[in-house]
Amino acid sequence: MRFIPLQTEQQVSCWAAQHIINRINDFKPTAERPFVLGLPTGGTPLKTYQELIRLYQAGKVSFKHVVTFNMDEYVALPEEHPESYHSFMYNNFFNHIDILPENINILNGNTDDHNAECHRYEEKIKSYGKIHLFMGGVGVDGHIAFNEPASSLSSRTRIKTLTQDTLIANSRFFNNDVTQVPKYALTIGVGTLLDAEEVMILATGHQKALAVQAAVEGSINHLWTVSALQMHRHFLLVCDEAAQQELKVKTVKYFTELEGAVAGTDYQGK
């Protein structure tokens, strides 16, 4: 695990965006050999997308040879709905960069056969070999994508029933009306995420502190989905100060000193 303890949400966003750009540029993608990037939605990555757009406009990166796979999508919510994850991604990121439309992959929550759609998505990922970097956020209960507590830690892309906590948390995007939040979603599985070459999770705010504690100091536990990433060879957790508040002082000190020791190296994980 590599843990990046920062101070502010803006620092988290800028650090994450620069890491993505470094990975893309170091990879030197081409049409025949694209860089494959996994992406989330929600409030946490929004500023990272804004920073990526700024750096793209400054000529620091091109997304022309980047293929993206999103984590999840609501079931039975029209793609044109302002709160669909299709709308979120296009409005907040894709419409502002040079990514090719055919390189964008988002689960179709309006298909008649959800199982077939999930299988198709898994096969599409496999067709590229692997996802090189998967960025994600984490829920207050430790869920990743829509892999709610007690999800199988070897799960693949599938349909999931959303918990009441998730419905309440997401109601802020639906005029605080929990009855308007879709009850089901298609989501990549924990196993799908673990297959990625590198996973970078962003956590900001005190409400994420218990999830961060579970990810860093806790045992691997299906009730805290994020804890499964302890098994990943290249798991990167980037947090602001508020999200670190449940960690032991010596834990933060250890990782802070470790980052200082490896600054400027090609260190990828421990």
UniProtKB/Swiss-Prot annotation:
Keywords linked to the UniProt accession: Allosteric enzyme, Carbohydrate metabolism, Hydrolase
So which residues are the signal peptide here?
A: none
CDD domains, per the entry: GlcN6P_deaminase
Site note Part of the allosteric site, residues: S151, R158, K160, T161, Y254
- Coiled-coil regions, chain positions: none
UniProt GO BP: carbohydrate metabolic process; glucosamine catabolic process; N-acetylglucosamine catabolic process; N-acetylneuraminate catabolic process
Q: Describe how its activity is regulated.
A: Allosterically activated by N-acetylglucosamine 6-phosphate (GlcNAc6P).
Q: Give me the reactions it catalyses.
A: alpha-D-glucosamine 6-phosphate + H2O = beta-D-fructose 6-phosphate + NH4(+)
Pathway recorded for this protein: Amino-sugar metabolism; N-acetylneuraminate degradation; D-fructose 6-phosphate from N-acetylneuraminate: step 5/5
**GO CC terms on record?**
cytoplasm
Name the catalytic site residues.
Answer: D72, D141, H143, E148
The UniProt entry, under Pfam families, shows: Glucosamine_iso
> Which Enzyme Commission number(s) are listed?
3.5.99.6
GO MF entry, a single one: identical protein binding
> What is its biological role?
Catalyzes the reversible isomerization-deamination of glucosamine 6-phosphate (GlcN6P) to form fructose 6-phosphate (Fru6P) and ammonium ion.
Outline the subunit composition.
Homohexamer.
Family membership noted in the UniProt record: Belongs to the glucosamine/galactosamine-6-phosphate isomerase family. NagB subfamily.
Q: What is this protein called?
A: Glucosamine-6-phosphate deaminase
Q: Please give the organism.
A: Haemophilus influenzae (strain PittEE)
Gene, per the UniProt record? nagB
